[in-house]
Every structure is written in C-alpha cells, then in structure tokens.
Amino acid sequence: MSASTMLLPFQPSSMSTAQLAAVSFLARYSGRTHRLYTYQLKRWFAWCEGNGLDPLVGIQRAHVEVYIRHLGATGLMDSSIVTMMHGVRGYFRFAHIDGLIAADPAVYARLPKVHRDESRTQGLDRLELIRFLQVAQTLTVHHGALAFLLGINALRASEAAAVRVEDYSDTLRGYRVIHLVGKGNKPATMPLTVPVLRVLEACRGERTSGPLIRRPLSGKPVDRRDVYRMVARIAKAAAIPRHLSPHSLRHAAITNALDAGVPLRDAQILARHADPRTTEHYDRARGNLDRHGVHFLTAYVAGV
C-alpha cells in the first residue's frame, strides 16, 4: 500500500483528510473490532487508489455501489460483503458527523440481502451439553473449567481466556461471583453456581492470582485460538459428530436456559445481549422445529 493510502502510524502533519478521518474513526475501537475495521478500510483505500479516487473527498454513492459489486466479483459471499462494508459505512458516517463531508455517500448504498436460516445454528441440546461438560472434566481441569464457563455462564471465547483467579474471589449477597469485561468493554458480574465453582477451584489449585485457564502441557495462559482447539478436543472426546466452536457452547447455554423455562429477560441478562431481539433469535432457532405449526396441522388433518 502506498503512502497515500496508509492509515498508520499517526502522522497528522503529513496525512490527508481521508487518512485523518480513518484514524479518528478507528480510535473508537479496540481489539478484534479495531483490527477488522482497519483491514476493511485498507481494502477500501487500496481500491480507491487503484481507481484514481480519494477515499473520502468527492466520493459519491455510485462509487460505493461499484465497490460493493467489486467485492462480489472477488468471490465474497453476500454475508461477507455485508460484513466487509461495516467499517466503510462507519467511516463515512462519522466523517459526515464530524463535518468532513457534506453528505454520507454510503448510507443509501444497496447491500446484498442476507437471509439467515434460524434453525441452522443449533448448538447442543440438553443431553449433548451434559455429555460435553462431563467429558471435559475427564481431560484436564483446564478443559473442565473452560467448558463450564462457556456452556453454563455463556462466556465468549476471549472472555473465558481472560478470566483470572482474582476475578471470582468476591462474594455478593451470599453468592460467589465472577467479574469480567465483555464485548464493548462492558463490565459484568455473574453468579457462580456450585458445579461451576467446583471446576474453577479444581483448575485454580493452590494459585491465588494470575490467568485461570492455562495450556495443560506448557502451563502458559490460553488465548482465543487455544480456546477453539480445546473445545474441538472436548467435542471429539465426547463423540459429538459435528463441528463445535466456543460460540456453539454459548449458544447452547442460552438455548438450554430458554428450554428450561428461564424468562426471556433473564436469558438476555445471562447472554448480556443489549437487544432482547438477539436473545429471541436463540429461542426461535430451537423452537422453530419443536413448535412448528406443521405438527399441529398434521394432527388436525391426520385422517386424510
């Protein structure tokens, strides 16, 4: 990438308006989101450079529409195109808010319609989740702790990897609790049930501080990639015949809570979803098959 399209390092005296706008936009984010949006903007900047365009000044909706078509021509799926445009659309939205451009050229750009089959992501049913948790404890104490944090407390992969021994030392209103920082740097406090606390204590051993879950062989703290590998190992040992990710366990925690009769509001708190409609999706994903209208209709006209 040439100097005209570089986003970093931050050198305001030599950066264009487009580059300064990009740095300003990216400064809002951190971690994986920052890296993702940086990559998306670099692709946008590179495409503009290849077509003799300034990435910000003079851009019209037609340019954005052509870029979206370009992404499709590279072989990206519709869902990937929508994801790829998140950073670009945010970039223009905040450039407009900051008064750098008169209008947002991306706000009305047409994106592919992505229709998600709500029954595709099933996670684990009750018996599968039980088997997963049981088998995890037979591997190592680290696998056991990870399985319960994902499958009972519905932690995300990065959240589980970041848990420290000190994070669950407090007691509030008679409950042992775990403190964590979730998506969007939002702090959260969750109660630990006796089975979860038992496996966490087994994993902790005699330690009083430091990362809780470690690589069983090296003893080094785990990262997100380790979490994915550990989940895959547990799934294989539990003879679950499909691919599982850490999100599969989070999904299982939420759907099984709803199946157990947990009210939607309480399930939303468990999942730490900002919007209850997100939690409703987990309920529909399981219920579409179990409570689908075809069952009732078939029984109604069973005599035909």
Model-predicted segments: where are they?
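Conserved catalytic core of the tyrosine transesterase superfamily
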Residues: 1-304
